[in-house]
């Protein structure tokens, strides 16, 4: 089981969600603890990945040696979603 951490940015992003979006995103993030590279996860670069949760994207990093997943951002899909990924995590 991997330990989960959210950056302050990711926590703010999650706090802004509501209703079904919140439930689905939180469930997806919790699932990363059991399976950090679920089906459909896409490697962005380096240790950074993204998963799709409806219209939302969860950007995160996996550190296998430490069994750690750090969620850096939760955002609605747009051209800006993936900008500056390295600075997030």
Task: Locate predicted features.
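A short, surface-exposed loop/turn module that caps and links secondary-structure elements
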Residues: 27-52, 82
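Charged, well-structured alpha/beta interaction segments
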Residues: 7, 20-21, 33
